[in-house]
Amino acid sequence: MAAQTTEKLQKLDLNGQSGDAKADAPAAGQAEAGEAEEDSDDEKDDGNAAPEAGAGGAAKKKKRKSKKKKKGGAKVQSSPPRVPVSNLFPNNQYPEGEIVEYTNENSYRTTNEEKRYLDRMNNDFLQEYRQAAEVHRQVRQYAQKNIKPGQTLTEIAEGIEDAVRALTGHQGLEEGDNLKGGMGFPCGLSINHCAAHYTPNAGNKMVLQQGDVMKVDFGAQINGRIVDSAFTMTFDPVYDPLLEAVKDATNTGIREAGIDVRMSDIGAAIQEAMESYEIELNGTMYPVKCIRNLNGHNIDQHVIHGGKSVPIVKGGDQTKMEEGETFAIETFGSTGKGYVREDMETSHYALVPDAPSVPLRLSSAKNLLNVINKNFGTLPFCRRYLDRLGQDKYLLGLNNLVSSGIVQDYPPLCDIKGSYTAQFEHVQIPSHSHP
């Protein structure tokens, strides 16, 4: 990192951790958000309980003071998480993300670009993102501590999704409520050779195993401002080198990203970092390969995949990052071919933005499109979400919407069977100065 100057540029990593899988291990220089993550609320409560255990008036005073603080909105989250973060931060001042400094090469702007930045970086924009980021952080921290082998994927996914809905204060059962806040997209739980876009459909009985490598990828959103962050969980240290490689690659992408940086340069740096690692499995050494046909992406309001891609290999897009855009910096590593194909049963779907007007002959398709528009808009959804809204016998209509180009399906993406894949991801907003 270059020396600081008065004209230095900065970028906001809203997740507060540059790809670190441990939610309770803050990154250096992360004073405000990091402190909140390091000490859990339960630990703070335990610390306050000890002085109050003694006899006398002092103990009573401390007890009364503690109650007064809670009445004003004590920062205490339940387990499992169910307290809306707006109750924990009554002044709507949510923790800032980690500030990552730019190098000197990106220390200039042009007037038009600064104007676009000022248009984007309004206070509501940042506050909505910070609120969504705090929701994601608290749910992520709980998930990392409580997901264990033996749980079903449905149990894990619904636990995360219920927590996100509770913390945003939007259950999404009334028309339009999910557009105000809640899940940014379905909770992905992709295991082993499956790298992305897998969540259990109704009736799925799959159980997490001790030797599994599971990617946990979920989004939280406030007013369509989606925080898209992912981590990988393992329960056998043999997979540590794979996780270290992908985590290092994501951190590298975060450091290299910035205003006016070409996407291809970010991809080249990511690939160099990741492919310097190897992993030994059953006595055989495997190079860790970037999954070359998976990318990071920019995020628009209510749209998870914007028009820009952030490659994770060299030779990619020459497009530049712009000030005030929102990017999901994500990397995928594999012990297999480093290339994924569509496989297994589809669960993820999303309404195509500006989809063409196509006459629908099936009444089930017309009715389902109305449900999708009113409840999800262009936010991704899965079959379980339709079940949750009381929809049934919708598959024929859903497939008709897909074949008509109105809804996009997102099948699971898998490398070769027997391989292992990992993912780490965080959201970042390149900005001219720390708002």
UniProtKB/Swiss-Prot annotation:
Keyword Metal-binding: yes
Places the protein is found: Cytoplasm
Region of interest called Disordered, as start-end residue ranges on this chain: 1-92
Listed name of the protein: Methionine aminopeptidase 2-2
Keyword set, alphabetical order: Aminopeptidase, Cytoplasm, Hydrolase, Metal-binding, Protease
Organism: Aspergillus clavatus (strain ATCC 1007 / CBS 513.65 / DSM 816 / NCTC 3887 / NRRL 1 / QM 1276 / 107)
Keyword flag Protease: yes
Function: Cotranslationally removes the N-terminal methionine from nascent proteins. The N-terminal methionine is often cleaved when the second residue in the primary sequence is small and uncharged (Met-Ala-, Cys, Gly, Pro, Ser, Thr, or Val).
A Pfam family the protein falls into: Peptidase_M24
UniProt-listed CDD domains: MetAP2
GO terms, biological process: proteolysis
